[in-house]
Amino acid sequence: VISGALVVGFPVLLTLALAVDSNRPSIIMSEVVKASLHPASLLTAVVPDLYGVDGPLAEFWGPPSVKFGVTDLFLARNMGEVYMGALALAVLGATLYAFRRADRDMKYFLAFVVALVLYALGRYTPAFTLLYYVPGADLWRRPADATFPICALLAYVAGYGLHRLLAGEMRWRIAPTAAVLALLLVACWAMAEWKDQVARASMPILMACGFLAAAVTLLAWIVRSAPAPALTMALIGGFCALDFALGSGPNESTALPPSRFEMLRPNSTNETIRLLREKLAANTAPDHRDRMEFAALGFDWPNASLVHGFDQNLGYNPLRLSLFQRFTNADDLAGLPEQRRFSKAFPSYRSIAADLTGLRWIATGVPAEEIDRNLKPGDLNLVARTPDGYLYENPRAFPRVFIATSTLRADFDDILATGRWPDVDYRKTILLADASDEKPRRPGTAKIVSYRNAAIDIEADAP
């Protein structure tokens, strides 16, 4: 125990120290509940494509779409999927009543599933108010993410039930099982009728009827005939594969065309990536290491900077230092124009903050003026128009390293709150919270010798 505590203790302490200064030391409940799982989404455990998650977004009618009114939920539609397979559902319907006599371990898993469902439903049950105050719970931003372990645990419980059936340790009857499954299908049909979506939902419901009927038939034959284990496994695996391929097929969250992610390939031929590579490589000055930014290019683009080694100001859902968050007001994502937000201290691409951070290259999916309303003609240079969007240069971007020859006392909290920067030459002056009134030093030079993730070597001549 002592050895284990020593092994994990140090990284845990480092994590806690970082969390205190991060942009996510905790997430307030008013924001967390916006990612609750709507109770109507539980019906996808029976009919996976009930709401049209596999089709065009315009045809999706499940929560949180307009068909359910104002829900104040912010979830991707695939987050409402809780399908674990027709065979698993059939086994649960056949054996769940018998788990009152199950092993203690299996009762634990069932209790855990109940707790996770209550957590996933978020604002829709009073239980979440209590669960939120369990230590550590306020670190999680989406209750609906609990659907991942819910489906995994229910599949595990179903596997245990199938084991008990095949071992002759449980008995089941087809009629009650079929009745339970039929009742669930009726609930799905009623939901479609209520929302006037029978035309769209009828085919997914009929397909679910077919798979559930086949699952019950397969289960009955396996239990009665007791085929060889290899054949049993082959039948179960083949059926589940067919079920997930047809009943819960690829959607925009799991299987977009590979061509859409060309910019994420290390050897990408994407024109925007190619131009950025060339521009970044062309600046060989020893004091430069230009930063860049992807904005309004789409959901997937922020990750391209990681693939290609670009130094980007933004990112996708990053863990940031809270000071950087206050300085930039950067959101979790900048895939759309309105998601690229600015702050008082960093009010525009044409600003002291943009120059000081060395932000030289800006790739956007729309004209930069639609993202930054403060821009005026000539503030940025349009370098290229690519199939993806626009590439701009900020010609005023500072080098990554240089020697400041004077200091100036500054109130950083005031700069962050008001955006009022001291009127000085920032190529010569460094702002400090507690600066002394020393005479300016003679100019010097600085250059980057090496730049790695864990170590940066800078050579300076500061007379």
Pin down the residues of each PLM region:
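Contiguous transmembrane helix-bundle modules in multi-pass membrane proteins
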Residues: V1-I2, A102-K107, A111-V117, L121-T269, ...
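Periplasmic/ER-lumenal interhelical loops and adjacent helix-loop junctions
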Residues: S3-L96, Y132, A137-F148, E193-I205, ...
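Extracytoplasmic
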Residues: I28-E31, P229-R320, Y392
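Long hydrophobic segments that form regular secondary structure
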Residues: E59-F112, L165-W172, L219-T232, R373-L375
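Short alpha-helical segments and helix-capping/turn motifs at coil-helix boundaries
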Residues: F74-R77, A90-F99, S259, N267-A281, ...
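Luminal/periplasmic acceptor-recognition loop/helix of membrane-associated glycosyltransferases
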Residues: L256-E271, D311-L356
